[in-house]
């Protein structure tokens, strides 16, 4: 079998297509957003490959695996087991890190357990158990003729007169002892002070170094070790200042006796009680009530609400503050910022042991006086948070909680013992905090000696390979300790890709969803190299991708189209790239051959130097105290290689600041910055991302864009409705009244099947129409409410042409290119790109003030060249209304049409975090240091 044959595929919008796909090749599936690429790649090929493999397992094993639905296809042959690597961002488990997902951390644990050198945390001395022979050899390696004495420590730094101990030693026949550093006779020991700490060491043997001492020394060492419980000291008799040799037969620090269990891998796992830091349980952060969150506006007074819930409207807490003010002589009406530091301390952290006279008044107006310390606002919140049973109280208080690195482990997540084990003078946390590129260099240069090199050889090979794969997919800037929650979708996908290459499987079908998301052009070549490497191992690699370089690198291209949704679902062209370019109907072919292209604008909107938004001193993550200047009213692109700090600057700094000041959001927490100026030019900030518009089948484009409300009002206004007394609520499928109660307005009923995937069957009462019979008797222009919800946007636009409010909203959905989705299509079936465009349409349809700040993060994800053209038209339209648009983007077609570019770099991770250049695309293209400039220049 050298091909995969698909016959009669009808999944979702596929129109009964037949395909022959070559095996062991790199295949790119492309086409407009919503044309059916994912339906073919994921819902047909992957689903069937996975399902057939899972069917071969026992029924018992199958119940633990989520089963894919059987795709609607007549026949597929030549499939191999399938692995899909999707865009879903990784786990939301705070314990997952880049190191644990890639399994590098597991190999590091093994490495440290097998060849690590434990040291004493206080004295930085290696802990090592030595045999008597090793001790003897060490002493004999000293210069010949040197006078030494062997001591056995009996008492270390303990108070007391110790007369009994000294008498015992003398009776055992020992002649001398060293007491507090002085050698004296045991027949006449000095009187020791009771209240002072003393150290007593018995002299076991005195000798000059020479070769024939081996036997005598061995016996002396055995005696000394037995006396002292495992430690011995060898001191120079002629030079009291010379360094002494410490020997230990225990696995312990010879100075303080600090010892630890034998090293084992679980000691280095922060997800195991044996290795996790006991203070933060291996999370690396501690939660605390943050004074900056509690006092959000220092200009307000305590009475006016500087602390939420403690102002004059809250009688109980406010009378406590008034009593406190009388005691410490401050004014509750004065702005919080003007009160002294001591008052701040007392209000937030309490009065300590100092008693204060509190006046309490009950509901009847009787006052009582009680004296007790004040616990402090933060301690009060902490106590209520711990004690409360109510989730509402806990949710309210959670708004004031911040995270800070754990004080005990300094954010390394590991307990003290594990942090003090070294491989070549480097502890595990130091390796975890290196960037992947840096770590790879470290392991390449790591030279272990002797037996340890043999033990570590295989472990080091595994670590080295995995690091290399991560570097090859462009992730050299991530650190191994980076929490998985903070990774973007593209990063998470490429990590999974790297782990797959690490697995080295052969004969598998890999299905990937746009692996180039979030990758700069510079890193794209390495990613394609990785995909070709997977293919060369002997795998079939199927990639859903719009990226020009990927399409050019493919062995076989499948172009699905010609349109999207109902207009798509057919194979427009397939074969090598030349064959695609030769087909005039193929949009992809036309863009690839240059017959169509996204034009560089003739003139750009000039920046007005008077109107700028200026953010100074941004220092989040890897940002190096940067100052961002954005011209107001322009379309700005933020560019830079992956990991250079774009998301930190815009999503973690600018957006939360603007949210707090413009939208009044209290929980948005910006990354550290100094100052921001120019927000007065805006009235609101809106972030348009690719998250789903709703997570339930009840959410749909009609409800989200607000089209559904006027539609229901139209139906309620029909004469028949008025005669029956139907209100708009009658036509909602979310409330009782008009909906079908058998399926509660879902139109489908979920049937749980064990061993098989859950199936949704159309409701047999309403036949999937969501409404009851009486509601469906009402018609507007000959259509029922169900038929209206079933229309595509295009049909609905014609149908409601005479209703201006509706026509305008539907027109905006047409403008963003969503002509093909249905009004009532469940939000869960929309792709990320589609959800984003529904949000854009909702923004466009509002009557704009022209003072909005829009933030978009990689809006071209999932978009074909033709879709990008539409998106740009919409963004330029928003800009022409006077709005300011900030887009984080790698796509050069978008970058070249921007009015202004801010380029970060020069590299990713710690090598980035600076603004290299900002200005018009023409200015930026001339910058030598910028990687973006190199790729942008030929486009202009």
From Swiss-Prot:
GO CC terms in record: cytosol; DNA repair complex; excinuclease repair complex
UniProt GO MF annotations: ATP binding; ATP hydrolysis activity; DNA binding; excinuclease ABC activity; identical protein binding; zinc ion binding
Main localisation: cytoplasm
CDD domains assigned to the protein according to its UniProt record, in alphabetical order: ABC_UvrA_I, ABC_UvrA_II
Top-level taxonomic group: Bacteria
Zn-finger segments (C4-type): 253-280, 740-766
Listed InterPro entries: ABC_transporter-like_ATP-bd, ABC_transporter-like_CS, ATP_grasp_subdomain_1, P-loop_NTPase, UvrA, UvrA_DNA-bd, UvrA_inter
Protein name (Swiss-Prot/TrEMBL): UvrABC system protein A
Source taxonomy: Bacteria, Pseudomonadati, Pseudomonadota, Gammaproteobacteria, Enterobacterales
């Amino acid at each position: 079998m050298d091909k995969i044959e698909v016959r009669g595929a009808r999944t979702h919008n596929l129109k009964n297509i037949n395909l022959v796909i070559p095996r062991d090749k790199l295949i790119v599936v492309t086409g407009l957003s919503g044309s059916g690429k994912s339906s073919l790649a994921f819902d047909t090929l992957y689903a069937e490959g996975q399902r057939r493999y899972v069917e071969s397992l026992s029924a018992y094993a199958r119940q633990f695996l989520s089963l894919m639905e059987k795709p609607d296809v007549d026949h597929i042959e030549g499939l191999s087991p399938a692995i899909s690597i999707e865009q879903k961002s990784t786990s939301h488990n705070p314990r997952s890190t880049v190191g644990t997902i890639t399994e590098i951390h597991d190999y590091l644990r093994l490495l440290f357990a097998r060849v690590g050198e434990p040291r004493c945390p206080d004295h930085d001395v290696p802990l090592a158990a030595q045999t008597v022979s090793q001790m003897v050899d060490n002493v004999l390696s000293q210069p010949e003729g040197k006078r030494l004495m062997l001591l056995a420590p009996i008492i270390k730094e303990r108070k007391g007169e110790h007369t009994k101990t000294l008498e015992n030693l003398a009776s055992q026949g020992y002649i001398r002892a060293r007491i507090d550093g002085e050698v004296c006779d045991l027949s006449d020991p000095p009187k020791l002070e009771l209240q002072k700490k003393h150290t007593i060491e018995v002299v076991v043997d005195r000798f000059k170094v020479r070769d024939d001492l081996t036997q005598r020394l061995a016996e002396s060492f055995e005696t000394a070790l037995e006396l002292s419980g495992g430690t011995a000291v060898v001191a120079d008799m002629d030079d009291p200042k010379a360094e002494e040799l410490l020997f230990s037969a225990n696995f312990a620090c010879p100075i303080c006796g600090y010892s630890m269990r034998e090293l084992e891998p679980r000691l280095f796992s922060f997800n195991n009680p044996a290795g996790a830091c006991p203070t933060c349980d291996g999370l690396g952060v501690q939660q605390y009530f943050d004074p900056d969150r509690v006092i959000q506006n220092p200009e307000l007074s305590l009475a006016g609400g500087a602390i939420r819930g403690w102002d004059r409207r809250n009688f109980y807490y406010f009378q406590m503050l008034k009593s406190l003010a009388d005691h410490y002589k401050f004014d509750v009406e004065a702005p919080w910022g003007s009160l002294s530091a001591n008052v701040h301390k007392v209000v937030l952290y309490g009065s300590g042991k100092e008693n204060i006279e509190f006046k309490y008044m009950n509901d009847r107006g009787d006052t009582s006086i009680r004296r007790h310390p004040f616990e402090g606002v933060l301690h009060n919140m902490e106590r209520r948070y711990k004690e409360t049973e109510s989730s509402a109280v806990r949710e309210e208080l959670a708004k004031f909680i911040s995270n800070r690195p754990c004080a005990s482990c300094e954010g390394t997540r590991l307990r003290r013992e594990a942090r003090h084990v070294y491989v070549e003078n480097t502890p595990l946390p130091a390796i975890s905090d290196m960037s992947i590129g840096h770590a790879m260099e470290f392991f390449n240069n790591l030279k272990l000696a002797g037996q340890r090199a043999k033990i570590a050889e295989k472990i080091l090979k595994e670590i080295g390979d995995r690091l290399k794969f991560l570097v090859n997919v462009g992730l050299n800037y991530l650190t191994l300790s980076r929490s998985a929650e903070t990774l973007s979708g593209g990063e998470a996908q490429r990590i999974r890709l790297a782990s797959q290459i690490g697995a080295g499987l052969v004969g598998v079908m890999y299905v990937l969803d746009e692996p180039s998301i979030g990758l700069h052009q510079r890193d794209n070549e390495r990613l394609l190299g990785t995909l070709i490497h997977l293919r060369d191992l002997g795998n079939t690699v199927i990639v859903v991708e719009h990226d020009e370089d990927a399409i050019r690198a493919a062995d076989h291209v499948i172009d699905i189209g010609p349109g999207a949704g109902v207009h798509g679902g057919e194979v427009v062209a397939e074969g090598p790239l030349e064959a695609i370019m030769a087909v005039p109907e193929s949009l992809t072919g036309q863009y690839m051959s240059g017959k169509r292209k996204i034009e560089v604008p003739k003139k750009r909107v000039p920046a007005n130097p008077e109107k700028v938004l200026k953010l100074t001193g941004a220092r989040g993550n890897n940002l190096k105290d940067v100052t961002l200047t954005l011209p107001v009213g322009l379309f700005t692109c933020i560019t830079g290689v992956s990991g250079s700090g774009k998301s930190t600057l815009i999503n973690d700094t600018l957006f939360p600041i603007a949210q707090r000041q413009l939208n009044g959001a209290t929980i948005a927490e910006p990354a550290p910055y100094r100052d921001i100026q120019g927000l007065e030019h805006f009235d609101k900030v809106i972030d348009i991302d690719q998250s789903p518009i709703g997570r339930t089948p009840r959410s749909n484009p009609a409800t989200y864009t607000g089209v559904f409300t006027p539609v229901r009002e139209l139906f309620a206004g029909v004469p028949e409705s008025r005669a029956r007394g139907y209100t708009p609520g009658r036509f909602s499928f979310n409330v009782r009244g008009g909906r079908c109660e058998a399926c509660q307005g879902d139109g489908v009923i979920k049937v749980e099947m064990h061993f098989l995937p859950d199936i949704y069957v159309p409701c047999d009462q309403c036949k999937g129409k969501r409404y009851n019979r009486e509601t469906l008797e009402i018609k507007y222009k000959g259509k029922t409410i169900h038929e209206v919800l079933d229309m595509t946007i295009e049909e609905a636009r014609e149908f409601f042409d005479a209703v201006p409010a509706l026509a305008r909203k539907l027109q905006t959905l047409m403008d963003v290119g969503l002509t093909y989705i249905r009004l009532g299509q469940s939000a869960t079936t929309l792709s990320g790109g589609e959800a984003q465009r529904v949000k854009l349409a909702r923004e466009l349809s509002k009557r704009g003030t022209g003072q909005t700040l829009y933030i978009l993060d990689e809006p071209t994800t999932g978009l074909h060249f033709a879709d990008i053209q539409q998106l740009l038209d919409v963004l330029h339209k928003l800009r022409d209304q006077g709005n300011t648009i900030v887009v984080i983007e790698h796509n050069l077609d978008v970058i070249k049409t921007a009015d202004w570019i801010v380029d970060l770099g020069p590299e990713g991770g710690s090598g980035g975090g600076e603004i290299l250049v900002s200005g018009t695309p023409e200015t930026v293209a001339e910058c030598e240091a910028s990687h973006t400039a190199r790729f942008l220049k030929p486009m202009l």
